[in-house]
């Protein structure tokens, strides 16, 4: 039963976690409870409301100072428009994970990406442990008793099971009582059905009240300076759409996960980019707007008006998408929301993960003690988790392990301040919001939007498909434009000699390998039985061998493809051009290799690293409060640092598209000299001396560096 006591704030958020991990509401829970004693009144529109005026092109309600920093390469933007117009989910996914979707196009791109996302096609959500326990208990009770105990969980025994139990218990009675028993069974079934329906209605009403309450908390979170906020007509319609979407999802998936406040926050954060009301531009403002803002909603084009006005005919194109599109995407908010939850809360199926781990050293673990088995399991998880993903408990443990390894100073300070040690109460729930709910509620909408782009664009390469297949799916994209997207952010490099001698020769010709070869090869032969060592090598080789698919083309081929629209002949010429005297780097189509939720761990570490200087100056309470409401990574330069705004803008953009293999300087002049191209970068910054830089692309790039640093350190320890 969903509790409605004073502690319901914490119970509603702890239902989808293990017993040792709690994600209750943040430290403002007491304020929320006091200010929102009657949530219904907060969401009910008044009898007379001020109509919301459409925002015109010249409207300056959103000042330049409050507009987010945004720069985007014009070629990539036009390519994104081309893929959007043709509903090319292959191309849109590529841009989403490599560069990010332009925020003004997310409302049309996200539905397309979600429809084809692997986690939506094959969904799996980690079931709540409470539901599993209650379901098991209800089944055992129904088999041992002829009467129902009135289980209140979404998973309950059917009336048929209860009826069968009653018949079995009454099987020893006289035949003369059969008619009476049948009548009693019918009466009991009728009573059970009506009782169950009434019980379900009560549960649904309780869930709906919790949803209303959590929606009201969002208003209070934004309008904390106002004791009472009047919800307008359009705002009320949006909140009603959100409420119905959350309710339908809960009813559909209630047998797997209970309602949790995170479900409401996911809907609220989605509504910050995707207009809930069809054919309108209204989205929720997000926490970046001041509490004095006149409304909870805003025209999402206003934030990027400078960028829009710098591109001819872009505003007209966007208005056609908003008000007149019937072809590209007409999916409802409820459908987008359901699919988004399936992606954000996805968890790998236990059987598939167990098979992969059991295949490595199964015979060696058989005769070990229980303690050794647990230790060995952790070693194997470190090598399988990056590719397969894991439960939230495993990801939290992995996060803490990587934090200690990659950011030891901050980890030590967290240890001194007792951060990451109190998952049983309200203290460290921020980490669950970061990792399990993918930044919902606690991150800036602009940072979260870019990170969600990355997760929605996550795609694995089909090993049965070759380069020509994917290049055709990308509509033979121009080589220079493809180069701007760079390699997979979480790329890794393996040693080709190790691939040959380590993978092929060890098993078949281990005794014939020359001892004078590389030391690493000798170590691998001597320690062939060491699961930890061989598995890490296998992980690196597997990631590097299938990192991307590519074709090697000659310089002439590059000139041909870049000077005109790419054609199928470009890839056909590739094999014959391999003998040319002048060979350029491969044409690469990057694909994802690391599980998106594991990648999110390194993105979270990168965010912590960027805030390290701030965090070490805060005390325990301030750290938790800060991490529960992380400020945006967009900020304004001081006046003394505005002497080179163009250089900084170029650097910020280049860092998000650089394909430098070793994480060199964001500005890669060599690449520009090899692939001459006009880098036209449009900015959303105002034309005055104030200049802002958005670091979220740098944060994601740094996450890739942390990933390679961790992988390298593990390999060094193995040797």
Curated annotation (Swiss-Prot):
Q: Which Gene3D superfamilies match?
A: Ypt/Rab-GAP domain of gyp1p, domain 3
Which of UniProt's keywords are assigned here? Cytoplasm
Q: What InterPro entries does the database record attribute to this sequence? A: Rab-GAP-TBC_dom, Rab-GAP_TBC_sf
Q: List the biased-composition ranges (Polar residues).
A: 374-386
Cytoplasm as a keyword of this entry, yes or no, is yes
Task: Please provide, in alphabetical order, the Gene Ontology terms of the cellular component aspect for this entry.
Answer: cytoplasm
Where composition is biased (Low complexity), the residues are 1-22, 135-159, 169-182, 648-660
UniProt subcellular location = Cytoplasm
Q: Does the keyword Transmembrane apply?
A: no
Q: Which family does it belong to?
A: Belongs to the OCA5 family.
**Official protein name in the record:** Oxidant-induced cell-cycle arrest protein 5
State the organism named in the record: Candida dubliniensis (strain CD36 / ATCC MYA-646 / CBS 7987 / NCPF 3949 / NRRL Y-17841)
Task: Name the gene.
Answer: OCA5
């Amino acid at each position: 039963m969903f509790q409605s006591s004073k502690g319901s704030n914490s119970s509603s958020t702890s239902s989808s976690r293990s017993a040792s991990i709690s994600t209750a509401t943040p430290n403002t829970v007491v304020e929320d409870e006091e200010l929102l004693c009657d949530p219904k009144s907060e969401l009910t529109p008044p009898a007379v409301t001020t109509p919301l005026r459409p925002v015109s092109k010249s409207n300056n309600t959103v000042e330049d100072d409050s507009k987010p920093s945004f720069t985007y390469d014009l070629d990539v933007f036009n390519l994104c428009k081309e893929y959007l117009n043709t509903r090319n989910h292959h191309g849109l996914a590529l841009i989403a994970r490599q560069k990010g979707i332009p925020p003004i196009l997310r409302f049309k791109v996200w539905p397309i990406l979600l429809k084809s996302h692997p986690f939506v096609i094959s969904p799996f959500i980690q079931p709540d442990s409470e539901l599993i326990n209650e379901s098991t208990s209800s089944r055992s009770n129904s088999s041992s008793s002829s009467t129902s105990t009135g289980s209140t969980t979404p998973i309950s025994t059917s009336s048929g099971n209860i009826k069968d139990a009653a018949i079995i218990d009454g099987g020893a009675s006289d035949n003369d009582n059969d008619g009476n028993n049948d009548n009693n069974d019918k009466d009991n079934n009728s009573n059970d059905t009506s009782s169950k329906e009434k019980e379900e209605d009560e549960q649904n009403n309780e869930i709906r009240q919790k949803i209303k309450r959590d929606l009201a908390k969002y208003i209070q979170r934004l309008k904390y300076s106002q004791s009472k906020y009047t919800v307008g007509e359009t705002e009320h319609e949006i909140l009603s759409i959100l409420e119905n979407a959350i309710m339908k999802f809960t009813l559909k998936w209630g047998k797997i996960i209970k309602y949790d406040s995170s479900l409401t926050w996911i809907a609220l954060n989605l509504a910050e980019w995707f207009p809930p009301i069809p054919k309108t531009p209204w989205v929720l403002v997000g926490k970046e707007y001041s509490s004095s803002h006149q409304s909870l909603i805003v025209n999402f084009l206003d934030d990027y008006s400078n960028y829009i006005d710098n591109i001819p005919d872009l505003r007209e194109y966007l208005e056609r998408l908003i008000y007149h599109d019937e072809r590209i995407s007409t999916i409802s908010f409820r459908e987008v929301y359901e699919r988004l939850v399936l992606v954000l809360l996805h968890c790998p199926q236990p059987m598939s993960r167990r098979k992969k781990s059991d295949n490595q050293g199964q015979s060696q673990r058989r005769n070990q003690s229980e303690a050794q088995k647990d230790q060995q399991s952790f070693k194997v998880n470190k090598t399988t988790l990056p590719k397969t993903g894991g439960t939230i408990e495993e990801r939290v443990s992995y996060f803490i392990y990587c934090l200690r390894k990659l950011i030891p100073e901050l980890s030590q300070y967290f240890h001194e301040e007792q951060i990451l040690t109190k998952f049983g109460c309200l203290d460290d729930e921020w980490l669950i919001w970061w990792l399990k709910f993918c930044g919902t509620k606690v991150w800036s909408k602009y940072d979260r939007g870019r990170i969600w782009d990355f997760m929605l664009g996550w795609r694995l390469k089909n090993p049965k498909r070759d380069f020509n297949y994917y290049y055709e799916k990308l509509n033979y994209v121009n080589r220079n434009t493809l180069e701007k997207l760079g390699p997979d952010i979480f790329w890794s490099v393996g040693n080709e000699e190790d691939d040959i001698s380590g993978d092929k020769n060890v098993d078949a010709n281990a005794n014939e390998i020359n001892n004078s070869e590389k030391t690493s090869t000798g170590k691998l032969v001597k320690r062939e039985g060491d699961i930890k060592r061989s598995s890490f090598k296998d992980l690196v080789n597997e990631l590097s061998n299938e990192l991307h698919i590519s074709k090697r083309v000659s310089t002439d081929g590059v000139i041909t493809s870049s000077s005109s629209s790419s054609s199928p002949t470009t890839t056909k010429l590739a094999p014959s051009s391999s003998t040319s005297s002048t060979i350029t780097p491969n044409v690469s189509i990057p694909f994802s290799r690391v599980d998106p939720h594991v990648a999110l761990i390194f993105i979270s570490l990168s965010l912590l690293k960027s805030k390290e200087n701030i965090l070490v100056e805060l005390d325990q309470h301030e750290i938790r409060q800060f991490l529960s409401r992380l400020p945006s990574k967009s900020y304004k330069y001081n006046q003394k640092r505005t002497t080179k705004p163009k250089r900084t803008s170029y650097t910020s953009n280049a860092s998000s598209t650089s394909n430098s293999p070793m994480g060199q300087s964001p500005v890669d002049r060599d690449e520009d000299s090899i692939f001459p191209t006009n880098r036209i970068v449009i900015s959303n910054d105002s034309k005055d001396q104030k200049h802002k830089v958005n670091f979220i692309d740098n944060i994601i790039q740094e996450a890739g560096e942390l990933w390679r640093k961790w992988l390298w350190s593990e390999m060094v320890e193995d040797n």
